[in-house]
């Protein structure tokens, strides 16, 4: 189209140039024909010129339209490119939204199932708890009724077991007492033999005056008969004290068993409170040591409200008397006949410590060790005879000394 417009312009310009240069020729024809041809040419020229102007206007309008269409085309292409990217993003977002919705529905279903299971389990646990509470109440009532029935009717089996245990203890004590009596009789015969075969008492007194604890072992002159008699006297005194203490302990146990038997026979429908209290009160009066078991009663009060204590005077070193065999045996028989039953307390020797495991446990004399010297044999170490109290003083202290309550 542009080429056509340019051709028209070139034609017009060429005509204008020829018009300037051309010289109006003289028509060869006569006047009318030349005028008519000239007029036809002028009209044709005017017509061509008008059409050329119209074509130029149309050409400019078409150019503007082409430019607008080109701009639209470029915009459409850009829109297509952007729209393709947006569609992909929209598709992705839609797929993600769809997956999220599916997951939400699945989670809702799972939550409903879990809530349903929890409600069922809670219901079952509540039912089990109620049943357990009912069982617990039943067991409590049964236990309370059994306790009431036991308090009203105590079982006889416990009394029988206690009775059997007490009988066994009494039997064991009787056996121990028999063995100790036998040993005491054997020791008595040995003591008589030792007195008959031993040296006279004057030599013993001389030995007591000569021997002193402050002297060394090399200065002591050992005397076989003197050591033997001193050992026999010491063993005699220990056995006598052990026998008297065991006698008192057996009396206390017999008294307690008598109380238990009488209370069990009379009061079968009530709890044995008094007997147990008596047993505990009497058991607190038993002082058990490593070798002896002494019984201690509270002494009767004097008119001024104080308990008497007969403290014997300590023996002086000069109060040394000679006892013959007859006097020693007579003191043994007198003390056996005059065993105090009114609560006399027998003092323990200072060398025996209180090493019992419990306060109310029985502790009998421990058997002699292999390292110790056998009974009746001479000891290598000389005993300080001046520190040993005389027999009449020990007997008096054994019978008359009472502790304060």
UniProtKB/Swiss-Prot annotation:
Induction statement: By 5-azacytidine.
Region (Interaction with TBK1 and IKBKE): 229-270
Pfam family membership, one: TBD
Superkingdom field: Eukaryota
PTM notes: Ubiquitinated via 'Lys-48'-linked polyubiquitination by TRIM38, leading to its degradation.
PTM annotation (Phosphoserine): residues: 331, 366
Chain spans, region Homodimerization: 1-198
Subcellular location: Cytoplasm
Coiled-coil stretches noted in the UniProt entry, renumbered to this chain: 40-197
Name of the protein this chain belongs to: 5-azacytidine-induced protein 2
Organism: Mus musculus
Gene transcribed to yield this protein: Azi2
């Amino acid at each position: 189209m542009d080429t056509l417009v340019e051709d028209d312009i070139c034609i017009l310009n060429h005509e204008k140039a020829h018009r300037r240069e051309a010289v109006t020729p003289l028509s060869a024809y006569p006047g009318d024909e030349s005028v008519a041809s000239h007029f036809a040419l002028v009209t044709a020229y005017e017509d061509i010129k008008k059409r050329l102007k119209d074509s130029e206007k149309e050409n400019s309008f078409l150019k503007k339209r082409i430019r607008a269409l080109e701009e639209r085309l470029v915009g459409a292409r850009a829109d297509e490119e952007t729209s393709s990217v947006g569609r992909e993003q929209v598709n992705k977002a839609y797929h993600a939204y769809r997956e999220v919705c599916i997951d939400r529905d699945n989670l809702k279903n799972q939550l409903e199932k879990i809530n349903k299971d929890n409600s069922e389990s809670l219901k079952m646990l509540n039912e089990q708890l109620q049943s357990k509470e009912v069982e617990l109440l039943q067991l409590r009532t049964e236990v309370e009724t059994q306790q009431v029935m036991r308090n009203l009717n105590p079982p006889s089996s416990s009394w029988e077991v206690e009775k059997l245990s007490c009988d066994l203890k009494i039997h064991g004590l009787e056996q121990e007492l028999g063995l100790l009596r036998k040993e005491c009789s054997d020791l008595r015969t040995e003591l008589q033999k030792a007195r008959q075969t031993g040296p006279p008492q004057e030599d013993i007194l001389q030995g007591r005056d000569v021997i002193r604890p402050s002297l060394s072992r090399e200065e002591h002159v050992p005397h076989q008969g003197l050591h033997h008699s001193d050992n026999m006297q010491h063993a005699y005194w220990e056995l006598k004290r052990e026998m008297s203490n065991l006698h008192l302990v057996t009396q206390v146990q017999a008294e307690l068993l008598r109380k238990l038997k009488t209370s069990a026979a009379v009061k079968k429908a009530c709890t044995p409170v008094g007997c147990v209290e008596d047993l505990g009160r009497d058991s607190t009066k038993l002082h058990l040591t490593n070798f002896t078991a002494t019984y201690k009663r509270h002494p009767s009060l004097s008119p001024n409200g104080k308990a008497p204590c007969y403290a014997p005077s300590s023996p002086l070193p000069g109060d040394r008397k000679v006892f013959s065999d007859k006097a020693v045996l007579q003191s043994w028989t007198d003390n056996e006949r005059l065993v105090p039953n009114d609560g006399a307390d027998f003092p323990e020797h200072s060398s025996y410590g209180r090493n019992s495991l419990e306060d109310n446990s029985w502790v009998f004399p421990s058997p002699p060790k292999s390292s110790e010297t056998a009974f009746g044999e001479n000891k290598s170490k000389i005993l300080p005879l001046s520190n040993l109290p005389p027999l009449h003083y020990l007997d008096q202290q054994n019978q008359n000394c009472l502790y304060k309550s």
